[in-house]
């Protein structure tokens, strides 16, 4: 993970980053609570679908697992899927993690967040809700293989902001959406979304069959340069934003490029 905004702020402060006692940082755990999902996205690394899958953990086992993670020093838990909002005990699970003292985030496609449950989402006190947006309307709907999913995701972001929930936009970079990245970042500001997470294609599940969609190296370099530019703008203008990338440690090479 490359924390672009964090890195640029540390440069602006002109102070060394303090070392943590003990040397190693506590791990961040992304827990796919279930594989069931209401979408069949082209890039899905877990090949999720709207059906039951055998062998998944019972809620009691999940709660016990959270206790084990906390005992092992895990402080950050991201609840994902599948679509985590399809888990019948999601809010109980989130509450248990919060009671254990964890930072608890939700990673969702956003289509199941609506006026009927936004209050419950707010009451769960997620520290962060990440909602996927993989291009503008036509591109996103084609990528997610469901018409209307773009509008539903945007509506979810607006509802989260109105409920004072910290929300982020999550985008998987592909050849199909790379040219739309500037527009997505403009949309981020328009919606007052505080975080942007750029993911690279994971070659697993349906993502393995969609490798031809992966962004070429030039596209990736251009995207990273743009994220550095937008992050720097926001810092200079005092905006509360956070730009992060994931699924490719080579992104850190851009740090050198940004200062040549």
Feature roles, as predicted:
Residues 29-31, 77-79, 104-106, 129-131, ...:
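Hydrophobic faces of well-ordered beta-strands that scaffold small-molecule active sites
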């Amino acid at each position: 993970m490359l924390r672009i905004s964090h890195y640029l702020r540390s440069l602006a402060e002109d102070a060394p980053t303090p070392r943590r006692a003990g040397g190693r940082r506590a791990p961040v755990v992304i827990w796919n609570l279930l594989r069931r999902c209401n979408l069949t996205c082209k890039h899905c690394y877990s090949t999720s679908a709207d059906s039951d899958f055998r062998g998944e953990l019972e809620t009691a086992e999940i709660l016990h697992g959270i206790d084990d993670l906390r005992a092992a020093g895990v402080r950050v838990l991201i609840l994902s899927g599948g679509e985590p909002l399809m888990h019948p005990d999601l809010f109980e699970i989130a509450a248990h993690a919060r009671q254990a003292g964890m930072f608890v985030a939700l990673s969702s496609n956003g289509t199941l967040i609506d006026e009927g449950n936004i209050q419950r989402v707010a009451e769960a006190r997620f520290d962060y809700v990440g909602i996927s947006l993989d291009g503008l309307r036509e591109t996103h709907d084609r990528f997610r293989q469901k018409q209307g999913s773009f509008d539903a995701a945007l509506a979810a972001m607006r509802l989260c902001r109105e409920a004072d929930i910290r929300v982020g936009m999550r985008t998987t970079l592909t050849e199909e959406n790379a040219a739309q990245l500037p527009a997505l970042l403009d949309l981020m500001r328009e919606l007052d979304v505080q975080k942007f997470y750029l993911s690279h294609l994971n070659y697993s599940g349906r993502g393995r069959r969609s490798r031809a969609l992966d962004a070429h190296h030039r596209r990736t370099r251009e995207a990273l340069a743009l994220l550095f530019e937008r992050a720097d703008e926001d810092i200079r203008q005092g905006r509360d934003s956070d730009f992060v990338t994931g699924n490719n440690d080579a992104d850190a090479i851009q740090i050198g490029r940004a200062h040549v």
